Amino acid sequence: MQLRCSFRLYPNGPQRQALARAFGCARVVFNDGLRARETARTGGDAFPTTGDLSTTLITEAKKTDERAWSGEVSAVVLQQALRDLDTAYRTFVDALKGTRPRVGAPRFKSRKDNRQAVRFTANARWRITTGGDLSLPKVGDVRV
């Protein structure tokens, strides 16, 4: 059984910055993964798996000076961005094979798009506090 909970959040100033950082990092990981897969597809190279992308774009990237900021957000958010990319790409490839209705290729996420969302799974250890707030990792207790 899968359970989904959607919450309307009312974050304060520092929490807004932490959430904006999470949105931005998830977008960057999604776009980098899409670029790697598109490069492999057009070049005829081996298709990078989600595990390979996770190692390259999340684990190793946190150790570099250029991407050290990706360590400031929960790793679950970044992993879910790669899972979303995997789902979108798998749907696209299945459509090319004819096993699904026709859909377009996954597109890069824009910084200017207002639709921003991240997912925290049960492994992210989010919880509802006794005061009714939502406790998110590396964000804090956010009013719901």
Task: List the model feature ranges, each with a label.
Residues M1-V144:
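Nucleic-acid substrate recognition interfaces
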